[in-house]
């Protein structure tokens, strides 16, 4: 009976996993068996999401992705890959985390990583930019993204802004923008042009760079109080007004512009997902490719009930939000489930909860010695971010083996049921050793 229940439960889980998108959503299910035929050998441009069913951010993306497929129907094809079911494609295209969105444009062998806002509108804009690029390539034209006399343009990387399209492209978009107001005769503008173009190329998919000829569009320049050239304004992510524009105060080399804009982009990224380590895949998703990985080991559910555990998890999420600019990975496991991990990081032996911060590239880690509280962890992570604190080599100098376990169901633990013993077969009158 228990075996039958397990089979039914497995069938339910598998059914739930495959229910992310249905044929009626317009999202094509892609697998290793049909990917080449559907995507690589097709002339159409594709937007492809690589996801894992257990990933919270993937689940949050579902309604926007369905909306995207509906909006792009007949223009751009939209597909999805369940990377948890088969890692072949995610490995082939270097997918390190979920969800990962790639746009397969004219050069199918070199898809573009999409790193912008996870909204249907923002993703659609990126996809349509690929359509425009492909059309211009076929026609042999450079397109209309030139920034005039400033020479700031390089293909589609620097976007030409005018009085007619400024509000629509900049203010009404969710993207981060840097806008250069220039004059064609300005020497400093001409010097900035190649640096601006180079920065735009490096920041593609993260921050949009535009250029507006202030001599041709004087009313727009006046609206933003432009008094000299070049003037660079920063427009934050999300819905914005003209009053939200800020002065750019960085340097004028490509590296300066990229560094300044990247800091703004990182500040706008969502908080990292706190991932439960239930198998090798979840462990890699949480920690692979991250500068550091914050690994917490929480008490067994019988020692710390659902309310207790959720309190710990809320603390970790709060701190993940605070340190999100570091782009660290965040993971947790129940004490005793991943013994090899605990042994390699020397945690758990002195009790739970415990924490270690790991640099898997250097195979070094540091253990939280203070209180597992918001203040205690904050102080520990602050020291780590400043390069302070004691570090030790990961035992064995290799990543620990991760075993597959069931994910926590969010409920209190249940003590194992004791089986009733039939005393009728036991002769209580005999003394036996």
Swiss-Prot record:
In Gene Ontology terms, what is a biological process of this protein? response to endoplasmic reticulum stress
The record's subcellular locations are: Endoplasmic reticulum lumen; Cell surface
Tell me the PROSITE patterns matching this sequence: ER_TARGET, THIOREDOXIN_1, THIOREDOXIN_2
Segments for region (Disordered): 405-433
Q: Which reaction does it catalyse?
A: Catalyzes the rearrangement of -S-S- bonds in proteins
The answer to whether UniProt assigns keyword Nuclease to this entry is: no
Null allele phenotype: Reduced levels of phagocytosis. Loss of both CaBP1 and Prtp does not cause a further decrease in the reduced level of phagocytosis seen in either CaBP1-lacking or Prtp-lacking embryos.
Tissue and organ expression note: In the blastoderm embryo, expression starts at the anterior and posterior poles and later appears as broad stripes. Following gastrulation, expressed in midline precursor cells and the posterior head with low levels present throughout the embryo. During germ band extension, weak dorsoventral stripes of expression are evident. Midline expression begins and is retained throughout embryogenesis in clusters of cells in each segment in the central nervous system. At least some of the midline expression occurs in VUM neurons.
The GO terms this record gives for MF are:
protein disulfide isomerase activity; protein-disulfide reductase activity
Q: Which domain of life is it from?
A: Eukaryota
Q: Which range is the signal sequence, renumbered to this chain?
A: 1-19
Alphabetically sorted, this entry's keywords are: Disulfide bond, Endoplasmic reticulum, Glycoprotein, Isomerase, Phagocytosis, Redox-active center, Repeat, Signal
| Glycosylation sites per record | 279
- One GO CC term of this entry? endomembrane system
Disulfide-bond pairs as recorded: 55-58, 186-189
User: Which InterPro entries has this protein been placed in?
Assistant: PDI_thioredoxin-like_dom (IPR005788), Thioredoxin-like_sf (IPR036249), Thioredoxin_CS (IPR017937), Thioredoxin_domain (IPR013766)
Placement of sequence motif Prevents secretion from ER: 430-433
Return the Acidic residues bias intervals.
417-433
Per the Swiss-Prot or TrEMBL record, the active site comprises 55, 58, 186, 189
- Assembly description: Interacts with Drpr (via extracellular region).
Described function: Binds to both apoptotic cells and phagocytes and promotes Drpr-dependent phagocytosis of apoptotic cells.
> Would you identify the family this protein belongs to, as annotated?
Belongs to the protein disulfide isomerase family.
Protein name, as recorded: Protein disulfide-isomerase A6 homolog
The organism is Drosophila melanogaster (Fruit fly)
């Amino acid at each position: 009976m228990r075996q039958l229940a397990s089979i039914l439960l497995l069938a339910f889980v598998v059914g739930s996993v495959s229910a992310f998108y249905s044929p009626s959503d317009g999202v094509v299910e892609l697998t290793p068996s049909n990917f080449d035929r559907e995507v690589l050998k097709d002339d159409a441009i594709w937007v492809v999401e690589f996801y894992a069913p257990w990933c919270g951010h993937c689940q949050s993306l579902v309604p926007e992705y369905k909306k995207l497929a509906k909006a792009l129907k007949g223009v751009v094809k939209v597909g999805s890959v369940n990377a948890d079911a088969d890692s072949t494609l995610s490995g082939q295209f270097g997918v390190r985390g979920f969800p990962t969105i790639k746009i397969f444009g004219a050069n199918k062998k070199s898809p573009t990583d999409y790193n912008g806002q996870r909204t249907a509108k923002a993703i659609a804009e990126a996809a349509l930019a690929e359509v425009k690029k492909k059309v211009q390539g076929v026609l042999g034209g450079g397109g209309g993204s030139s920034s005039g006399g400033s020479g700031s343009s390089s293909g589609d990387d620097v976007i030409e802004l005018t009085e007619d399209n400024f509000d629509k492209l900049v203010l009404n978009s969710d993207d981060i923008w840097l806008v250069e107001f220039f004059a064609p005769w300005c020497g400093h503008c001409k010097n900035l042009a190649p640096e601006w173009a180079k920065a735009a190329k490096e920041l593609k998919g993260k921050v949009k760079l535009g250029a507006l000829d202030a001599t041709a569009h004087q009313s727009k320049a006046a609206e933003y109080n432009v008094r000299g050239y070049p003037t660079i304004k920063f427009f934050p992510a999300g819905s914005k007004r003209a009053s939200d524009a800020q002065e750019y105060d960085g340097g004028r080399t490509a590296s300066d512009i990229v560094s300044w804009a990247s800091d703004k982009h990182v500040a706008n990224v969502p908080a990292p997902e706190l991932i439960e380590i239930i198998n090798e895949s979840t462990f890699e998703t949480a920690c692979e490719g991250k500068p550091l990985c914050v690994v917490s080991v929480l008490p067994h559910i019988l020692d710390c009930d659902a309310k207790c555990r959720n309190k710990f998890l809320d603390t970790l999420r709060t701190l993940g939000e605070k340190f999100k600019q570091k782009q660290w990975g965040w993971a947790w496991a129940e004490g005793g489930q991943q013994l090899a991990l605990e042994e390699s990081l020397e945690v758990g032996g002195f009790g739970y909860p415990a924490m270690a911060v790991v640099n898997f590239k250097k195979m070094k880690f540091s253990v939280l010695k203070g209180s597992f509280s918001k203040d205690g962890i904050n102080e520990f992570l602050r020291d780590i971010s400043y390069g302070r604190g004691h570090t030790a080599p990961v035992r064995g100098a290799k990543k620990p083996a991760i075993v597959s376990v069931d994910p926590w169901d969010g409920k209190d633990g249940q003590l194992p049921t004791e089986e009733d013993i039939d005393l009728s077969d036991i002769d209580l009158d005999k003394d036996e050793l």
